[in-house]
């Protein structure tokens, strides 16, 4: 049976990572968390105090401490920078609020997109991000673009933070998500937008199971036809 490439894009907290992980497990595919890669680069910049004028230093640190993914005992995915487990560190609010400017740096995107494409070559992979269908995997057999209201996405992020023990204010989260939407969709390099051949799905009020079912049925149909 042919293994396809699945690209899931959308704004912050639209449910991309959650559904991508479930579908990858259901189909036996590899899940690549591209957002974690950009967050890792952001973590490096913040930890060392690097600015957008010091891209070479960020890339140097990425080379010395490459990004890797490992599975935890419970099946969850751990993110490492070299030997350092940064799984929780890259989800902190300071990283979330700075990832847009780091991910907009052309040199950072070029390096990480190169890594992502190399991993995806064999197929049987599902990636989520903001430019997977448009830039990283324009040849993906299935492209999905998830959207949801700012209110709902803020609610999701608030609940996620509670579960991780991260303090946050709901109204502040709404403002931050709206601001990030603007930054991501207006950046010069790989702006957030749906690929022309992507299926746009509004997840507002839709359960995770409902979104998973929609995407998985589309994927299985493509595989059956190939």
From Swiss-Prot:
Listed GO biological process terms: nucleobase-containing small molecule interconversion; pyrimidine nucleotide metabolic process
Keywords: ATP-binding, Cytoplasm, Kinase, Nucleotide-binding, Transferase
Pfam families: Cytidylate_kin
GO molecular function: ATP binding; CMP kinase activity; dCMP kinase activity
Cellular component GO terms, alphabetical: cytosol
Record: residues binding ATP: 10-18
Enzymatic reactions: CMP + ATP = CDP + ADP; dCMP + ATP = dCDP + ADP
Compartmental location: Cytoplasm
E.C. designation(s): 2.7.4.25
Family assignment from sequence similarity: Belongs to the cytidylate kinase family. Type 1 subfamily.
Listed name of the protein: Cytidylate kinase
Organism classification: Bacteria, Bacillati, Bacillota, Bacilli, Lactobacillales
